[in-house]
Amino acid sequence: MKRSTTQILTRLRELMLRAQVGDSCGISAYIVPSDDAHQSEYQCQHDERRSFVSGFDGSAGTAVITTETALLWTDGRYYQQAEKQLDSNWVLMRDGLSATPSIGAWLAKNLPKGSFVGVDPRLLSFRVWKPIETELSSAECQLVPIEGNLIDEVWGEDQPPQTSNKIITLKLEHSGVTIAKKWDVVRQQLKEKNADALVVSALDEIAWFLNLRGSDIDFNPVFFSYLIVTNDELLLFVDSGKLPTDFVQHQKENNVQISVLPYASIGIEISKIVSTRESKIWIAPTSSYYLTALIPKSRRIQEVTPICVLKAIKNDVEIAGFINSHIRDGVALCQYFAWLEDQVNKGAEVDEMSGADKLESFRSTKDKYMGLSFTTISASGPNGSVIHYHPKKETNRKINDKEIYLCDSGAQYLDGTTDVTRTLHFGEPTEFQKEAYTRVLKGQLSFGSTVFPAKVKGQVLDTLARKALWDVGLDYGHGTGHGVGHFLNVHEGPMGVGIRLMPDDPGLQANMFISNEPGFYQDGEFGIRVEDIVQIVPGQVAHNFSNRGALTFKTITMCPKQTKMIKKELLSDAEVKLLNSYHQQVWDTLSPILSREGDEFTLSWLKKEVQPI
């Protein structure tokens, strides 16, 4: 559904003409990133500036507005969605295609020499800022920070307020490690780098390190804050009114003292550290240009933070929580799919939105449930071909026995975060649909069963998931795997699996948890994706990669994959064995729980779904 952006763009261009750049007045272009001041993947409503100015509400994209043109860069997950949501004022720039120039290259080519390009320096990471700055400089143009966000000024009183919800403590029974022990590890790494301080702006890193959780961003258990870690101080920049009532006790239980400062004073404190200390200051390259520029270049260590890597490698308590939460989640998924199949077979009216609500209701009954981990992708027929589709009133479609149904969903539990996709057909799939599904499944089985050297980059494994599709000229326009937080963000770095190299990927290591999610999308017809969460565990092979160590994956998602969609002749004997073994594991894990709960209806459905092929 398109909405007019004409008035918004007119007002923004008026402000661009008056924007102050030193002694000059006026900018030729204004960049509107998706990010908030913490470079979060998802934003609270207050920070949805790119969505406000463009009408496109996908999670990834950058808007560029010049005096005459408005352009939106987004990746392959969102091409279809952007086409449907952008009005005639906008040009869609398909990021990732070889013919699409970068933002900096386009601006350098299309703006007059001497032009200024403005951006809010808090919303653009240093890593993104520098190449744009370099490309503009080559055309004698400048990228300049603009104080005061122009979109906020256009939005005015209609802009939703900044969220400021209460923070909760995460007890050791769920976090597994005290803050003091985490601090010891960070101190050692600071010492090795000859650094005095670590500046942390990523919200999930702060929440994990401090064993705290929040709800300032929907689906993401984080809270707006900054953190500075030194050898002898923990400085938390946060609205003190958000702190939990047991914050003093929380510090005692974690053997630390945390100094609380106003959220907005982070810049002042960084400048103070710069002026009073001589050693280096560690800050992630993904932090904002604003924060990074406060630190002289000669004093910066710009690397992924030690907290980011520590967080990705789960401890024993987190591992147990991940496994247990996925079992409870699997029960809810089976209850939903059993119910849904029965409703469709009866001819009952179930649409994408009511289906998503029903799934949420099943999850909400499970122990330690805290909410969803993202908006459920409940997609029937052609809606499934929109990779990150979310049902709305104007797009809501009935789930029926004539179309493929794709359901990508997840939940937050006190002891883990889930993310799972299943693709089903409640009638008779076409031969092409069955072939596409089987090739997606082959890729998932290949990826999930591979053995690889420790610390290999995720990109190296990506083609394993695509090969069966590539064999017949098919592919998918998204990554194969992302990290998953522990009662934290459903998308977590620094590792990942995709065609592109993740710049901060430290290599895959034991007890990281990532997704395994190949797919295929036939534009305007259907979508297929099969997604599990896998744990990286030691692999058993004859040799040991010259003592590097062997790793493999262990699937922890517990939900059957619809065998009706499979063309068995396309599977090897080994693949059939892998699938049957997985289904036996699902049965052995979930059937005792369903029996104990007296849920014979779901138990009967599960028994049917896990029959060997």
Curated annotation (Swiss-Prot):
Positions with a binding annotation for Mn(2+) 2: D419, H482, E517, E531
Catalytic function, reaction form: Release of any N-terminal amino acid, including proline, that is linked to proline, even from a dipeptide or tripeptide
Keyword Manganese assigned: yes
A Pfam family per the record: Peptidase_M24
GO biological process, one term: proteolysis
Molecular functions per Gene Ontology: metal ion binding; metalloaminopeptidase activity
Function summary: Catalyzes the removal of a penultimate prolyl residue from the N-termini of peptides, such as Arg-Pro-Pro.
Family statement drawn from the similarity comment of this UniProt entry: Belongs to the peptidase M24B family.
Protein name: Xaa-Pro aminopeptidase ApepP
